[in-house]
Amino acid sequence: MRMDGSDFEDRKVSKPSPVLPFDVSNIGDLSQGVHSPLGISHFDSKNPTPFGRSTKNSVYEYETVTPYSRFKVDKKFGSATSVSPVHTKAEEPGLGLTPMNSADFSNKIASRYRS
């Protein structure tokens, strides 16, 4: 309750969820282990928009509850804070034991093929 007697929850205005630009109605059954060619797991077809498409929110809700999802969402930080994987000698012989990020690794490999 606010000081003026109104409830903050009553004054919230929700924004509509954007519609994904592709149709998900023909994506295979999740029990079959089928994934879309876009690399995104099967969407929850029980929560479509009136146009037969899933919204970002329904995809997010589905991916956070299913163990079959390929993408895990870090609710606290989001994907913007993801760190490049570290490559070591075990993955590429001759680089030494010094860890390096993906860009360094790519440059090291590419430099072998430059003329």
Curated annotation (Swiss-Prot):
Disulfide bonds: none annotated. Residues 82-115 are annotated as: Disordered. GO terms for biological process: meiotic cell cycle. Keywords: Meiosis, Nucleus. Signal peptide: none annotated. Residues 99-109 have a biased composition (Polar residues). It comes from the Eukaryota. Has a role in meiosis. This is Meiotically up-regulated gene 168 protein. The gene is mug168.
